[in-house]
Amino acid sequence: MTLTSIRRGYHVIKTLLQYGLDEVLPPKMTPWYFTLARSSLFWIRNKHKSKPGGERLKLAMQELGPVYIKLGQMLSTRRDLLSDEWAIELAMLQDKVPPFDGVLARKAIEAELKASIESLFDDFDETPLASASISQVHTATLKSNGKAVVLKVLRPNVEAKILADLQLMSQTANLLEYFLGEGNRLRPAEVIEDYRVTILGELNLKLEALNAIKLRNNFLNSDALYVPYVYEEFCYPRLMVMERIYGIPVSDIAALKAQGTNFKLLAERGVELFFTQVFRDNFFHADMHPGNIFISRDHPENPYYIGLDCGIMGTLSEVDKRYLAENFLAFFNRDYHRIAQLYIESGWVSEKTDLQAFEQAIKVVCEPMFNKPLDEISFGHVLLELFRTARSFDIVVQPQLVLLEKTLLYIEGLGRQLYPQLDLWQTAKPFLEQWMAEQVGPKAMFKKVSTKLPYWSDKLPEFPELIYDNLKLGRKLLSSQQQMLDKYLKHQQQAHKSNYMLITSAVLLICGTLLFNQDATLWSPYVCLTSGVLMWFIGWRSRPKNRKF
């Protein structure tokens, strides 16, 4: 551990204690050695006693800087770990930091391009259009075609700062898991590892560019989503160049109303977009907060979304997708037994879980939701409550499912902000039922067979030879099994014979010893003892050696 990391560690601890976060921990998470360590830092006082715990945590993370702000944003979606009060406070964290000097941005851009900005772009503006914790955005126009573009460039030395903070977080999380029993349930090391993977992905703008290209191709000619064109020839790990868009921020409801936006259609398209990305494309935007979503200015009666910032994308396995779809359908059919089965079958919960106890726990949580009309039931909170319940049964949390839960909460919240009467179930159910029919019905089987047909037809000439080889292998296997069985039986026979001889020798030796004290003929004890020793020797020599079969 370097001197710099020690200083940073002290600053983090000091900040957390100044916000009194040690005081909001439950007693079982504060053993005697924790109390002793806190007492040794007696000069650091809680300066925010009047504020609730969730607000203290939010302010502390805000003060600690960008890496902790992003961690707080991620934790705000983990309501299986945090209370609603704390999660709501963390959701208010804003990833806004002062911009860095435009001259430094120019140098960083030219270092990636290995050329001057003026040789490729006109009207480069050193004043940033937007600034965040990891990157900054500048505007320009392309010399080649005169089109307006934005240049997204990483902050200087941002990687080193993030890696240093991640290392400190990881060490702290490991200590928590080691010392605190409750820490194992909260799995801090797992949370930090998920965060590490997410934030390191955001540090590679070339990867973000490839994600944006893929998402754009998935929705070419779509009425629901537009992804700006990426100029791949100008994209590098620290630089990304893309088409500039002129939309209305989705959070600017007043501007959307002023242009006469069709909010009902917009909200329904948001839900359709989510399910299309997850179930049709298996590639979904996992950072769809309001800052990354704009609405088209043209044709407000037929509006579409404009998606930005593809640094965090999610995918699900085919198995996870099917179980997830079945989960939603089972919930709205109130089939709690099937939900419990699905969690176990999918491997999300251990197969050793008591099915009846798990089913009852799900029922206790979910049944009260049906006191509301269907259009008031939150899809995101259904998924959240199911995962929270499963947590008490040691669910194996899948990072991709956490991303999905976060995205669903964003989309659902956004949809109901745009159109409060949005019936998410009515919009989503036909999509899910159609997708399930395509996956498990006759059409799905025919499609899978059709997909495999070219491979099978290519292998068809080899079938006779494969059958012959398998029969030959089968005969060898049977012969080998018979040989092993013969060896095993012989081994057992030898073992029985040896045991018989050893037991008999023990009996003779005992009898010979007893006869010395009886009125027996002079030679009787010696015959028994000699016979016993001889039989013991024969039995010992005839013992089978240990063999593995």
Swiss-Prot record:
Its EC number is 2.7.-.-. ATP binds at L129, A130, S131, A132, S133, I134, S135, Q136, V137, K152. Its main location: membrane. It is found in: Cell inner membrane. Pathway: Cofactor biosynthesis; ubiquinone biosynthesis [regulation]. The chain crosses the membrane at residues 499-516, 521-540. InterPro entries: ABC1_dom, Kinase-like_dom_sf, UbiB, UbiB_bact, UbiB_kinase. The active site is at D287 (proton acceptor). GO terms for molecular function: ATP binding; protein kinase activity. One of its GO terms (biological process) is regulation of ubiquinone biosynthetic process. Residues 123-501 form the Protein kinase domain. One of its GO terms (cellular component) is plasma membrane. It comes from the Bacteria. It is a multi-pass membrane protein. Pfam families: ABC1. Keywords: ATP-binding, Cell inner membrane, Cell membrane, Kinase, Membrane, Nucleotide-binding, Transferase, Transmembrane, Transmembrane helix, Ubiquinone biosynthesis. NCBIfam families: PRK04750.1, UbiB. Is probably a protein kinase regulator of UbiI activity which is involved in aerobic coenzyme Q (ubiquinone) biosynthesis. Belongs to the ABC1 family. UbiB subfamily. This is Probable protein kinase UbiB.
